[in-house]
Every structure is written in C-alpha cells, then in structure tokens.
C-alpha cells in the first residue's frame, strides 16, 4: 500500500551536486500545525512513523496521533517506532544470536528458506562485558587480562564469528576496542542514514543495555530494551511504546570553576529522581544546554536509567557538528547531516517558549558543586565537603535508613593485615547477617558479573610490608565506565591531577586496587599524546583493559588476606569509581560503601586512602618534603584542561583507531576459528545450546480473538496455580537472573559438574547465557534474594538464596531450590505464580530474567509495580504481568504461599483491563481480588497470544 503521506516526500540540497530525498516534517506541519511545537525527540519518532506508514503495521492514524501529541493528554495510545539500527553488548548479544540461530533451525525443520531470518537493519555487537581486572597497576596488565579473557570465552567468541558470516547485517566489534556506548558515540553513530532509493532519515536505535541512552548526547533517539524486544526490532518489527510525556529540562548559566560534567550529571540524577520521570522522555533546552560540549551531554544521557527516564535527549546543533568533526567523521558526512537537520527545521537547541513540554524542570549550572554519589544508590548525591560526615552518620544508622548498622565506637578501629600470603578461610557466598541487623523487605540491587571466573589468577599478596585497614578505607579506585571515560575533559583532568600529585611526591598505597579501563582506545592515545599517562601509571592507574570492567562488577578479587580482614572484622570499606551504578555489593561482595565520582576525584581519593578524610578541609596527603598537600594544590584549572583538548579531538586518530576494527582486530581475535554455514550445527557445549523456545513450533497461530467469550477467557486463564515465591520491593533483574558466580551446590553448578565442568571452569551466569540449561537453573538463584515464603527465624531474619517451599497435593511442604520445585510442579502439570512488591524487575535490561521465568513454568507475576523493560520482556515471553490496584499487596491479603491461585483476565485481553484473581486457602475459604492486566498495548496482546514475541515474529517472517 502506498504511503498515505507521499506528498511529504521532498528533496533537500546539501551543497553543489549533492541532494537527498526526505519525508518532510515541515510539509507535514501544513496538515498538522502542532508538529512545529513538538519536542525535538518526538519529531524524530514522528519522522519514523511517517516514513514507514504502510497502512498495515503503521497507519495514517498512527501518524496523526503523534503529530497531534498533547503535552498533558492521557497516555493510552501506542507508537510503532521502526528504528534504524540495533546495538548489542556481548552478555545480551550471545543469547540473542542463539535465538536467531534457533529461528533458522526451526525454519529448516519446516522446509522454509532460512534466509528469511535475517536482520533487516544493521546490528552491531560490541564485546565489552567479558574482560576482568585480574591484573592491575602494571603496564602489562591489559595484555595479561586479555589473554585470560580469550581463554575463558573461546566458545562464545567462536559463536560470534559464526554469526558474522551467517548474517549479512550482523557485525562484531572485537574485544579490546572499547565499551559499546562509547564506541557507538565515537564510531557507529551516523546522525542520518540514506536508503538505496535516496531517501534520508534520522539515525535511531535500540540497544540491549540500559545505558544505550548515551547516544542521546548527539541527538540520536535511542534507549535500552530487553534482548527479546531487540530481536524483534532487528527483524523489522516496530518497537511499540505508549505515547510518552516529554519533560523539558532547562539548563541556565554555566559551570563554576572546578566543577566537572560528573558533578553535573549527579546533580541532574538527584533532581530528576525527585521529579519522578520514569517512563518519560527528558529533553534538554536553554542557554545552558547550548553551552555544553557533546561529551558533557553524553555523560548526562548515559545516566538516564539512573534518573528513571526513557531518554535524556539533546537536540543537534553546532556542538554536535564540532564533535562529529573532532571524532573523525568526514566533511561530506557532516555537511549532509547538517543540511538534513536544517531541512527538517530541527537544527539547534530550543529556547524557552519554542517547544511544548509536559512539564519543565530547571537547573542553574552555577549551582552545581563538586560531588560524589553513594554509598548505595546513584541518586544519593553528597557534596564533596560532606562525604566524610555522611559516612560517619551512615556507619551506625540502621540498614533500613541506608546505613550500615555498625557500633559507632568501632568506626576508627584499625585491623592488621599480614603481608605474607596465608591460607584464608573462603568468604562464604551466603554470609550470615549479624543478629543485631534489622530485617526489612526491600531487596538490595546487585547487578554484577562474577569474581570467580574460570582460569582465575591467584591474587598476589599485599606488597610493602604489613598494613592496617579500617572502616572507610578506599580499597578499590577505578577510572572506569563509558559514562566518564568518554569525556575528555574529566579524563584530562585526572591525568593533570596525577601529574601534579606525582610531582609533589604523593603516592597511592599499594594495597589499593587501582585501574584504568577506558571505553575506547582513543582515551589512552590522547592521554599518551598529552604526556599524562605515565603519571597515572605511577599512581597505579595503568591500563587494565578496554571494557566495562569495574563498573559492572568485573573488578576482580582483592587479596585473600584483605578479604579475610574485612570478613572477620565486618569492616565497611569503600570503592570509589567513575561509573554509573553503585548498588550494594555490585562492585565487590566485600565492599559495602561504593561512591561514584569524577575521574580526578577517583585519583584524589586513591591518594587519600579513605573517605573519612574531608578533602575540602584536610590535606590529601603529605608530599616528598613532608608538607601537607591540599586538593586545591593539585586540582587542574579549566585553562590547563582546555590547552590539552587538541589531543582528544583528533579526527585522524579516531579514524586510525576505529579503522582497525576490521583491518587489524588483533591476533587473539584472529586466532578464534568460527564455523561456517547458514545454520548453526549446535555442537555439544555448555556455553551455547539451541534454546527450546521453538520446540514443536508450527506456522499456525492462535485463532482470532472473539468479541467476547467465556471460552476465550478460560483459555488465557491461570488455574489452580501454586505460589512459588513471595518477594518484597525492588527485586532486580540480577536477583531474578544473576550475572555472577555459580555456586557448586546450586542447580546450575550441579548440572555443570554432571556435564564434566570442574568448579574452576564454571565462569559466570553472564558468560553462559547462550545455554538455557544453565540459565533456567540459575533463575532466582541469586545468593542475596529472599523468598518471604520461608518462615522467619526467631530474630526475624530471613534465609537468603534461591529457595522456596514446595507444596505437594496432600498439603505437605518441603524446602528446596526454586528450580527443583518448579520442575516438580511442571511434572504435575501445575502452573505457578509469583507475588512481589514495588519496582519488580528493576535494574539491567536482562532478557533472561523473563526467559528463565517462562522456562520455570511460571504463568504470571503479580506485583505492586513493574520496571519498564522487564514488564515488556515478561509479555514477550508469554508470562502475564498483573498489578495490584490501589494500596493492595500480597501482605495485605495475608498470603503465606500455601494458597492456590486462579487468575482470569478480560475475555478480549484488552490492554490494561481488569483481571480477576481468586485465592483459595487451605481452610477452604476463597477471596476474589481485582488486578490490572499489564499487557499495555494491542501488539502486546498479539505477542502474548502467540506464546511470546519470538514465535509471533517467526510466524510473520515465514508466512511472508
């Protein structure tokens, strides 16, 4: 069907002899004048809807709905958004590739053309999640860490190489080039695309990582989705989402001397969390926004998940052009981009009154002060001068008040650490909580990969003689994460601070684990060119690798004797890192206090050695002459930083660096041998296995949904289900599907051992996401998760770990792993349900949290609220998400886990309709409760009825 708005297809000029066609928003505005008042981010979405209007997936009504967007309307309509491309990281990319391979296998079994299973948009997988800080502090650390990385992940990398040759549009940026979001910003982002027929359109994307929003800093619409939704997007399906509110964020003034982009983003995060922007677009405007360079904008966009927004968007302007020039895009590309944005009348940052927003938040940049965030949440900003005092206060506060529940008199106690390597008692995976610690139902956030990876290196003993450690001591100091290492201003500041510190004779104690793990090779190039890298190395910040590393918990272990001292004395030690998340135990299981800081402050705290020192009123340390050295003595000025910026904005350097992705990917990557063929042969492997989602797959989908019938309602109902878990608030996707270490006594550990894998080769759950046998056994296996079905102890404590009570048909119960109970219920033909509190599924965009739930036979999750991506993923796997109404909760209903549950949704499965839950208790009584069905859009109804998004998409592809 021809586009109903074909008259909007216009031509624009981009210089002599260069022109392009485009679907013109100014032309559309003649029909819908409201378009001229739309936020810039929504205009990019509108262009996609307009261009892809085919009368089937996207209709003229969809175009009209977006064009007539009202800032304060109720949000009930969905937008079908076709993205230009998809980006992946390796922990989420490998299972996604396994699903694509399984689709081809299913097509082959049906005698269909496997070539129909092909990404219809460019897909780039950047390998960044697998390298760990095993070695650090020395110049050969990166080489040693990469060799270990390749040894641990050989099978995964072989599978990626198969994908590269099997799919025409699937590319891989090999290990050692950087972090997906920084590589996206510096290399993959184009600003605009052009089809073979000459039609140009905005760059846009989704990524299978929550911090995909970093790309918003260059005016590209994009956000994080689960792997399931990402697969649908790459196979040509629109990304469906409810029409959003767009919150305008007006920045005024300018940053004061000594403040950094990190200080700014921590202030923005704190402010927007208070304004509750979950599920909304945030768009920055105003004079202050115009003044920000793209790296500063990208830092703010990166942390959109931390302030809860779907995006933190910055429109394209002269600063964007400067950045594209400085990072090696060609002059022709940049001219074409600018001409296109001007033709769309979208070049430039809006000023107050130019655009209509749902609400406006304001911040004067001059009010921003040097800050850290922590010690447990990124939104808990602390002014630099208050860090020490805040730590002292929290030290003795109850855990429920964000404290550490310690006795105040032990705060300053020091503990001896022997320097010689001893055989230390292993730190338990499930350490008992102190009896005095209060218990509460808010689960901790711990999205971290493993410390106990295969082929782990033995950590060397503490150097430099016996030491003492105590509460507040900094034991990990990491310049890490794309959030900050993408920003030359703060990286040069760190190098300059290190230079001044070394020149004054300051040093870092050798027992502090220091590391530098930037998001691209260009960072070390410009630090080297500016002659600053040697000073960082002298303070222990030697290059450890290019990847996420400490930011995602790949910090490696501490020395055995330090671990033992922390564990035996229950010390509250600290990590200071330039990352974006600091949830408890994320960075290291024995480090309880984690602070986010700018790279120069990371270096400063490494020198100070403790967060109990007030760096505003106390010296950082003593110099070589024995004199006190203050932070002001070594803090670089903005003039000093700006003089070195030429080294960072080096177009030739960026082109040379990223030119090696294909030309010189490295000997380690070239040494990986991938298999050939259009379909994968699924050799026996504990890393990669054909997922079961297409077993018994047929081309026949569900029958058309009748207008209303009891039979239809009955078919979708959950009957006589058992409760498998009762959870509290803030259950994260890491609780549901951990990325970290695999216990040998867990169901996954048992399975690996049964298949010949020794404990030292377990690697992590994150690295084994290509094998459903491991992952389904690892679902709800986080050692810190608390199933409140289990009875409380005499002191009120709750047992931790993936356990439940299995109820047999005679009414008897038995404690066992959730996986084992789930398999028993499946064998009996009984479904199961989960009950939870607020923010169920918060944290990382982890599709296995939904896949594992489905494979355990769980039919529904009933919660007080859901995180956006996980709710979508549950629907995408055919699991019903349902929400309590009003103040209702499972606690208010008095559920214990002994009950059986019926859930009957609306007969038509209308989005956000009412469902009826019937609770049957052991005493024969029953109770009816109204729930809200959290299938939010019509397309999600189709996904659910097909058994999930993957069967739906495969039927679409093979029926075409």
Predicted regions and their residues:
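Fe-S-dependent hydro-lyases/dehydratases of central metabolism
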Residues: 1-960
């Amino acid at each position: 069907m021809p586009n109903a708005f074909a008259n909007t297809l216009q031509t624009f000029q981009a210089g002599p002899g260069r022109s392009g066609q485009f679907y013109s928003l100014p032309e559309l505005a003649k029909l819908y004048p409201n378009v001229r008042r739309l936020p810039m981010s929504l205009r990019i979405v509108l262009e996609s809807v307009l261009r892809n209007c085919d009368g089937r997936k996207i209709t003229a009504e969809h175009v009209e709905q977006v064009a007539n967007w009202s800032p304060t309307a109720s949000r009930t309509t969905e937008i079908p958004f076709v993205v230009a491309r998809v980006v992946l990281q390796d922990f989420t990319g490998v299972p996604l590739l396994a699903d694509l391979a399984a689709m081809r296998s299913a097509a082959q079994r049906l005698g269909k053309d496997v070539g129909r299973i092909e990404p219809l948009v460019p897909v780039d997988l950047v390998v960044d999640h697998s390298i760990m800080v095993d070695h650090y502090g020395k110049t050969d650390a990166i080489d040693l860490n990469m060799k270990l990385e390749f040894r641990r992940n050989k099978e995964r990398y072989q599978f990626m190489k198969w994908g590269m040759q099997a799919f025409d549009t699937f590319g891989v940026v090999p290990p050692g080039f950087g972090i997906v979001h920084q590589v996206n910003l510096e290399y993959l982002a184009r600003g605009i695309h052009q089809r073979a027929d000459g039609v140009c359109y905005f760059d846009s994307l989704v990524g299978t990582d929550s911090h995909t929003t970093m790309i918003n800093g260059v005016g590209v619409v994009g956000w994080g989705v689960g792997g399931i939704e990402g697969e649908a997007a790459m196979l040509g399906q629109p990304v469906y989402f409810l029409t959003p509110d767009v919150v305008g964020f007006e920045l005024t003034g300018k940053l004061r001397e000594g403040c950094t982009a990190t200080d700014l983003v921590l202030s923005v995060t704190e402010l927007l969390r208070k304004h509750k922007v979950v599920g909304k677009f945030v768009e920055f405007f105003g004079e202050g926004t115009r003044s920000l360079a793209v790296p500063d904008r990208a830092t703010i966009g990166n942390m959109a998940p931390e302030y809860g927004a779907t995006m933190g968007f910055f429109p394209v302007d002269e600063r964007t052009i400067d950045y594209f020039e400085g990072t090696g895009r060609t002059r022709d590309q940049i001219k074409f981009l600018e001409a296109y944005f001007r033709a769309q009348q979208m070049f430039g940052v809006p000023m107050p009154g130019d655009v209509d927003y749902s609400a406006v938040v304001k911040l004067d940049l001059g009010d921003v002060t040097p800050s850290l965030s922590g010690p447990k949440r990124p939104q808990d900003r602390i002014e630099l001068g208050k860090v020490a005092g805040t730590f002292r206060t929290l030290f003795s506060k109850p855990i429920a008040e964000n404290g550490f529940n310690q006795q105040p008199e032990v705060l300053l106690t020091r503990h001896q650490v022997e320097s010689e390597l001893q055989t230390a008692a292993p730190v338990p995976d499930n350490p008992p909580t102190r009896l005095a610690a209060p218990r509460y139902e808010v689960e901790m956030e711990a999205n971290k990969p493993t410390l106990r990876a295969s082929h782990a290196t033995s950590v060397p003993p503490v150097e430099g003689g016996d030491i003492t450690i105590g509460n507040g001591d900094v034991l990990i100091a990491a310049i890490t994460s794309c959030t900050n290492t993408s920003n030359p201003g703060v990286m040069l500041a760190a190098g300059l601070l290190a230079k001044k510190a070394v020149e004054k004779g300051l040093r870092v104690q050798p027992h502090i684990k220091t590391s530098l793990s930037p998001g691209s090779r260009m960072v070390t190039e410009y630090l080297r060119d500016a002659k600053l890298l040697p000073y960082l190395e002298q303070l222990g910040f030697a290059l450890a690798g290019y990847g996420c590393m400490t930011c995602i918990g790949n910090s490696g272990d501490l020395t055995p004797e330090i671990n033992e001292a922390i564990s035996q004395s229950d010390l509250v030690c600290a990590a200071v890192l330039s990352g974006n998340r600091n949830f408890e135990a994320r960075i290291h299981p024995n480090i309880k206090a984690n602070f986010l800081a700018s790279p120069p402050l990371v270096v400063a705290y490494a020198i100070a050695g403790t967060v109990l020192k007030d760096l505003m009123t106390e010296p950082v340390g003593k110099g070589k002459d024995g004199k006190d050295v203050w932070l002001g003595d070594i803090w670089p000025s903005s003039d000093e930083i700006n003089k070195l910026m030429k080294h960072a904005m080096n177009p030739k350097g960026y082109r040379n660096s990223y030119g090696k992705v294909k030309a010189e990917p490295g000997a380690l990557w070239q040494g990986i041998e991938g298999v050939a063929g259009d379909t994968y042969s699924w050799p026996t492997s504990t890393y990669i296995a054909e997922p079961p989602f297409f077993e018994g797959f047929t081309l026949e989908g569900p029958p058309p949904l009748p207008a209303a019938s009891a039979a239809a309602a009955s078919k979708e109902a959950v009957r006589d289900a058992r409760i498998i878990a009762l959870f509290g608030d803030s259950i994260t996707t890491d609780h549901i599907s951990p990325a970290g270490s695999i216990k040998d006594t867990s169901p996954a550990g048992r399975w690996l051992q049964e298949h010949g894998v020794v404990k030292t080769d377990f690697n992590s759950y994150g690295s084994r996401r290509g094998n459903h046998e491991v992952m389904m056994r690892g679902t709800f296996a986080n050692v810190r998760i608390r199933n409140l079905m289990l009875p409380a102890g005499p002191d009120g404590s709750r047992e931790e770990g993936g356990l439940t009570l299995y109820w047999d048909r005679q009414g008897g119960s038995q404690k066992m792993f959730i996986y084992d109970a789930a398999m028993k219920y499946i064998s009996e033909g009984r479904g199961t349900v989960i009950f939870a509190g607020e923010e169920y599924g918060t944290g990382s965009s982890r599709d296995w949290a939904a896949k594992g739930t489905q494979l355990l036979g769980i039919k529904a999750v009933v919660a007080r609220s859901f995180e956006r991506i996980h709710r979508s993923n549950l629907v995408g796997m055919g699991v019903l998400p349902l929400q309590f109404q009003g103040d209702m909760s499972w606690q208010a209903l008095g559920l214990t886990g002994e009950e059986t549950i019926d859930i009957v949704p609306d007969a038509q499965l209308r989005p956000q309709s009412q469902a009826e839950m019937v609770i049957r208790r052991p005493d024969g009584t029953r109770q009816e409760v109204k729930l809200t069905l959290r299938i939010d859009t019509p397309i999600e109804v189709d996904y659910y009825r097909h058994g999930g998004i993957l069967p739906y998409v495969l039927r679409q592809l093979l029926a075409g």
